[in-house]
């Protein structure tokens, strides 16, 4: 199917390119009209375009003028004019396609065209980058164009407060990483107040390095988790057992799939050592996960490759970028197993609170587009999964880079010796070299060898990535030798002789100028700084060109051809010369796992010495075959992830939509009344499903009713109301009567405490119940998915079984939300203090064990009474009102909700306590899994004085953490 679809997609490319070419000519034809405009006139066009949109004009109609406007603004701010091919790329992005543009063709500048055009709608545009550095850099650099045209620009970064995030999303254009956008979406759907939501919809997004984000990283879901109960002693116990087990005897390892399997012999040994009869008895099944993780930690996770141990802590190293992922942890107890293996302190495990895959997050956008240098090979997957077409954009200048054949050595030692010799030759003649490695370990090994040879070089890996952009920007200078993990520093152009834009920006930064903090001074100083930088690199650029340009040297093939091509693409940008070559050994992971035996056999037959490489078409084909197998395997994994997540995605859409209704308070009273009816009807249906009325257990049914609300009549009274004959009773009669009674009780409660207070109580209660039930459901769905594969042994389709059981569990959860919410709403005690205050008290009026008690916040009991009285006096309209408010303040347990609608319901039981720290797990920049732990401490700094305090006490901020005594 993908093959046929690929051919169909390619047939349409010519038609799209003709359309883009026509638009390009149209933009060029009006360029002079914009050159003659003053800065003020150019800026005024933004308001004109917005008005034309309001008057009914379409975005497509504005495209030529808007693009010409941005082109002229870029010339005046950055000194850069969009090439014709960039105009074509920008149009492709506007129409919701993926623009395939080779490295160095200016994707970042290209994106400014459709970003500006779509930002005119006022709905917000999201620009998605692969890391925080690029998000900040692009927001600053490209932001100069947008700000010149009167647009606001925001950037999202992990350390930002909710208020700062909200402000960034309110901007016309928002830059950030895929993980940050996704996590904000999940957090918004965990928020207890609209004030805590930061995003304002999903209108249009442009994803940079779209193949990396939407394909390579798609199989790793975004997960927000909190601490869960665990027994850490089992990690230690199994860390002792794993070394005693023998590979291929007691267990088997599949390195391709990164899985392990215990054999019968291994099971027998483990049972003997643990003193248990059967490892697979239900009481012992949790131990299987500990065992598997311990073996994985032993066989699949290597120190200094996958992680490092520093200061008694296990820190993950990104497999592809080589960065240390501080605060990130592996899932499913894997990190704890590694900690036990390394004999460091074992940190707590986490429970999933919210979860979504990148595939489903990006499908939320009304319009989606992307940019990359390598997308055509994945065109079918982009079309099937995201409904995105791929448009290959021509290069501005012909590509003349020379890609040399791979050299394969018998041993890794011989390979690295040959690499050092090659680097030494290039360095001696002054040709710059960029060396790509696959791990921190390999980059440090090569660095030591280069030092021994006396070759000066820069190392770019997890231990010095703070300088990576500066190092990469200078990697094209004469004699430069840069050793970098494969993906490090991407997004920064390696220009022969040096990067003048980077040099100019660095100079202004040293002078204390910033495009954000001092925009006017920065713009005034920029032209001169850029001119100086261009003169500095001009002569050196020519010398490097004469030497053959940048030489990219790969020390190992990656599992994806796309990553290899991205590394190669560092050389030969914008028509410059360059060359690339990969050095391999039979010990490389890719060669060892796929087809390495064939190459080994040939080398043995030829009796080649270790330092003699083999260079042949067959080797290239074998490598391509290996990479193809891995790519296909990963594609199947992504498809499988999507199929299973689609089940959860539909459930998530339903629960998030219902949650949003509650959060907004729309028709909340009617929602609660509907819940009451549904729960009571369910009770009646269950009790009257079988037999005649004489057989129904009405006493048991009334007991169930009384656990929900104080029912005011008995079953006997209902029979009397219907002529004293039980046989005339029907389920409808019972339902109708009990509903009316429940509505009357609820209406009385509302009249007692006030409509506004009741709505706030309803909102907080339902949200807390809904969130807890959803968390429990996520846990149960994870547990279901873990074991669903075993259904295949019973000749059942695991996916269909997962869909069926997942649906049943979801329906059960929805019923549970309704029942628990109304039970709480009927039984919570609300005390009304007349005339000024209404509060939710600490007590629960529930008569049954099933009612959920409320616990008053301790902060309220220790409130400074004098401060409360003073605040009450300030807000009183008269002396009498002030005296009344002072009396109220002396005995208050919570903030007024009747006047301000700011009631905050305390946690529904111990388990509802919000965790102090949340953990964020998502795909890393290079396709691995990365985690960070974030303190969920309240955002006090940006809280208005009269808003509820973020600590959750239920009091106003000015009377809680905003009080003078609390301001430190």
Swiss-Prot record:
Reactions catalysed, as given in the entry: ATP + H2O + cellular proteinSide 1 = ADP + phosphate + cellular proteinSide 2
EC number: 7.4.2.8
Cofactor dependency: Zn(2+)
Keyword Acyltransferase found: no
Broad class of where this protein is predominantly found: membrane
GO terms (BP aspect): intracellular protein transmembrane transport; protein import; protein targeting; protein transport by the Sec complex
CC annotations in GO: cell envelope Sec protein transport complex; cytosol; plasma membrane
CDD domains the record matches: DEXDc_SecA (cd17928), SF2_C_secA (cd18803)
Bias-annotated ranges (Basic residues): 955-968
Protein location: Cell membrane; Cytoplasm
Membrane topology term: Peripheral membrane protein
Ranges of compositional bias, category Basic and acidic residues: 858-868, 883-898
Domain of life: Bacteria
Keyword vocabulary terms for this entry: ATP-binding, Cell membrane, Cytoplasm, Membrane, Metal-binding, Nucleotide-binding, Protein transport, Translocase, Translocation, Transport, Zinc
Comment on bound cofactor: May bind 1 zinc ion per subunit.
Pfam family of the protein (one): SecA_PP_bind
Annotated residues for binding of Zn(2+): 949, 951, 960-961
Record InterPro entries: Helicase_ATP-bd, Helicase_C-like, P-loop_NTPase, SEC_C_motif, SecA, SecA_CS, SecA_DEAD, SecA_motor_DEAD
PROSITE patterns cross-referenced by the UniProt entry: SECA, SECA_MOTOR_DEAD
UniProt record similarity statement: Belongs to the SecA family.
Quaternary structure note: Monomer and homodimer. Part of the essential Sec protein translocation apparatus which comprises SecA, SecYEG and auxiliary proteins SecDF. Other proteins may also be involved.
Described purpose of this protein according to its UniProt entry: Part of the Sec protein translocase complex. Interacts with the SecYEG preprotein conducting channel. Has a central role in coupling the hydrolysis of ATP to the transfer of proteins into and across the cell membrane, serving as an ATP-driven molecular motor driving the stepwise translocation of polypeptide chains across the membrane.
Entry protein name: Protein translocase subunit SecA 1
Organism field: Thermobifida fusca (strain YX)
Gene name per UniProt: secA1
